Amino acid sequence: MNKIFSLVVLCLMTGTLMAQQPTANQAPHASVTPLTSKDLPDFPGKEVLMITVEYPPGSSDPIHRHNAHAFVYVLEGSIIMQVKGGTEVTLTPGQTFYEGPGDVHVVGRNASSTKPAKFVVFLLKDKGAPVVTPVPE
């Protein structure tokens, strides 16, 4: 029974990993790691979520929104960010970027095709709301 269970788990994991692999025409996907979340008693219905995002070389995000206040702090590498109606900016370690709840994030990518980039994001959002909402192009 344990062998069958192990085989099923292995097959599921392999399928999941294969589904996440970019094709030859796609940029590699970003890796998002939740660090912590905290309810804010002084702000009923709100929570703070802190995540790290790692962009492999050449990685980029699809157009999206957060429906949250998002505060970005670059840890390593260089990233390019832009919200709809805003100016495209290149950020390096120690620099910050802000997205408001109504902003549509039209550019988010690693500035390098050879080096990874990593940043931390603090999101002030409605409790239980999704972190990212896709926006049709």
Predicted regions and their residues:
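A short, N-terminal "cap"/entry segment at the start of jelly-roll beta-barrel domains
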Residues: N2-S6, C11, G15-L49, Q82, ...
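Short acidic-glycine-tyrosine-enriched beta hairpin
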Residues: L40-G45, E54-P56, G85-G102
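Extracellular/periplasmic catalytic domains that process cell-envelope and extracellular macromolecules
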Residues: D42-G45, R65, Y73, T90, ...
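Short, surface-exposed binding/anchoring microloops in extracellular/periplasmic proteins
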Residues: P44-E47, T52-P57, D61-R65, F71
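Extracytoplasmic
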Residues: G45-M50, H69, G86, G102, ...
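Histidine-centered metal-chelating micro-motifs
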Residues: S60-P62, I80, F97, P101-N110, ...
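Glycine- and acidic-residue-biased ligand/ion/polar-headgroup-sensing regions
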Residues: H66-G85, P93-Q95
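Ligand-binding loop in jelly-roll beta-barrel domains
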Residues: E88, D103-A129
